[in-house]
Amino acid sequence: MKTPVPTAMADDLRALGLDAKSLPPIEKLEPRTLRGVMKLMARSLGVKCNDCHQEGDFAAPTRRKKIAAHMWDEFAAKMAFDAGGGAGGAPLFCDSCHQGRVQLLDRRDKKVLSKWMDDSFVAKLVQKDGKSMECETCHVDMDMHFLAKWGQ
């Protein structure tokens, strides 16, 4: 598992008219901007369009599209790297954690995974609204399968 890093795509987002430090909800993006964002997401995860979209019907809802929308709205838009004293640090985007891979977590050893998540997310990220970063920030009620819920 690789440690999350500040996004390398802030300039790419800026070229689409977006500020990586202040992303709007994904459903508010204009179609042209959304297509550009999807290309950045694909590059961040090392995937092709049909890895998330249904071939022949790109508008159809799929599990991965739903998860990507939640990741945008709940992670990229609401979190940043700690600037040593609170919100407003370096921006977070898909490439920050995924770094060219769809799956970034090794779930074989729960203790190792828990420590890595604590070190990588709780200790290094902040919520832009100033609330403290806790396990429950993502794992509501300590549900360890929130992505499965998002994909429904």
What are these language model-derived features?
Residues 62, 93, 134, 148-149:
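Secondary-structure junction/capping motif
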Residues 1-46, 51-88, 105-129, 149-152:
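Sequence context of c-type cytochrome heme-c attachment sites
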Residues 137, 141-152:
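Short, low-complexity, Pro/Ser/Thr/Gly-rich segments in the mature regions of secreted, periplasmic
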Residues 46-56, 91-101, 131-141:
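The canonical Cys-X-X-Cys-His
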